[in-house]
Regions:
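Short intrinsically disordered terminal tails
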Residues: 1-7, 71-79
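N-terminal acidic leader/helix
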Residues: 2-31
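Generic detector of N-terminal low-structure segments
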Residues: 4, 55, 67-68
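General helical structural elements
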Residues: 11, 22, 33-35, 66, ...
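Intrinsic disorder/low-complexity segments
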Residues: 14-17, 21, 41, 45, ...
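Acidic, low-complexity, intrinsically disordered interaction modules
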Residues: 25-63
């Protein structure tokens, strides 16, 4: 389960910057929330995923949103 969560975090962190490049902040946050929900439906731990991306979901600018996502990439999805 731990490896599945790590893999999900890494995949989401890789996907979001590409998928949300031209989006407004609220659109990007909505896309991130949908992606997290899909992984939770696939059996990942909701608490782990939500904790990993909470800083991004609570950000107030696009720059901080993408910075938080990039931080997850640098961590390699480790919690």
């Amino acid at each position: 389960m731990f490896k599945q969560n790590e893999k999900a975090i890494a995949q989401i962190a890789d996907y979001i910057p590409r998928a949300c490049r031209g989006m407004q902040l609220q659109e990007a946050k909505a896309r991130l929330e949908k992606k997290i929900a899909l992984y939770i439906d696939d059996g990942c731990d909701a608490a782990v995923l939500n904790a990993a991306f909470a800083p991004a979901l609570n950000s107030h600018t696009r720059e901080s949103f993408f910075s938080c996502i990039a931080a997850q990439i640098r961590k390699g999805g480790n919690q």
